[in-house]
Each structure stands twice: as structure tokens, then as C-alpha cells.
């Protein structure tokens, strides 16, 4: 019985060490994501914003708490939304081959032309990482 308890204790310590390692890796990823020079927005496959980094907050001219849970579509200029929705549907199902295009954001009171690049995270249903780069 004591041998089994010792094995359980060792397994528990191994699992705890792995959890601590994963937490440290996640924190490192979050810091990298937040401080990346490029603007990144992560959405669910339906386009709802899950996360946005500091550069994206600057480009979109919105606070993070406003962005989280909002459809990315509402930040696209009205006349560009139909095209964005169509591309989002193709990207979300894995059908799109061209995942980079230009669109216009309605950023606060300004309109900003951006090159937008979408990358599927894992499986198409897992989510989409969007890179937004202002066009000069």
C-alpha cells in the first residue's frame, strides 16, 4: 500500500511540474503576443474576437474590453463588410486559398486601409489569427 501511495505522490509531483511548465509557457506566449510589433486579433471561427494585442488595440482604436466578444465584422467599414463576411466563411471552412487582401477598418472616427492576413489556428473550427497592417 505504501508503495502505491509513493507512486501516486510521484505521479502527482510530475503532473504538478508539467502544469507549472505549461503555465510558464502560456505566460511567455501572452507576453510575446501582447508586445508584438504587428497588430494581431484572434477570433473564433465565427469571427467573434477572443483576443487582441496592444498593436491591434492601437490600430482599431478601441479598448480591449470593448473588443472581446465583438464580431470583427463590426470594425470593418460598412461597404466592405459583405466581402469580409464572404471571406470569413471561406476561411472558417478551410476553403479559402487567398487569405491576404486589403480592406478598410472603421477605426473610431477614422477609416484606415489595412492589409489583412488570416491564418487558421489548428483546425478550421479552432479559430483564426488575423494580422492587420496599415497600408501607407
Please provide the spans of the model-predicted regions.
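Short, low-complexity N-terminal regulatory "tails/caps" that precede and couple sensory modules
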Residues: 1-24, 135-136
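PAS-family sensory domains
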Residues: 50, 99, 106-114
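PAS/PAS-like sensory domain cap-loop motif
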Residues: 56-67, 78-79
Amino acid at each position: 500500500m505504501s508503495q502505491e501511495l509513493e507512486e501516486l505522490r510521484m505521479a502527482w509531483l510530475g503532473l504538478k511540474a508539467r502544469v507549472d511548465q505549461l503555465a510558464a509557457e502560456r505566460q511567455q506566449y501572452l507576453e510575446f503576443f501582447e508586445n508584438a510589433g504587428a497588430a494581431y486579433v484572434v477570433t473564433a471561427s465565427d469571427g467573434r474576437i477572443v483576443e487582441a494585442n496592444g498593436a491591434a488595440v492601437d490600430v482599431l482604436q478601441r479598448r480591449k474590453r470593448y473588443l472581446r466578444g465583438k464580431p470583427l465584422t463590426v470594425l470593418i467599414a460598412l461597404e466592405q463588410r459583405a466581402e469580409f463576411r464572404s471571406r470569413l466563411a471561406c476561411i472558417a471552412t478551410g476553403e479559402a486559398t487567398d487569405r491576404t487582401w486589403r480592406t478598410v477598418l472603421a477605426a473610431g472616427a477614422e477609416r484606415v486601409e489595412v492589409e489583412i492576413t488570416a491564418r487558421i489556428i489548428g483546425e478550421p473550427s479552432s479559430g483564426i489569427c488575423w494580422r492587420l497592417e496599415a497600408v501607407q
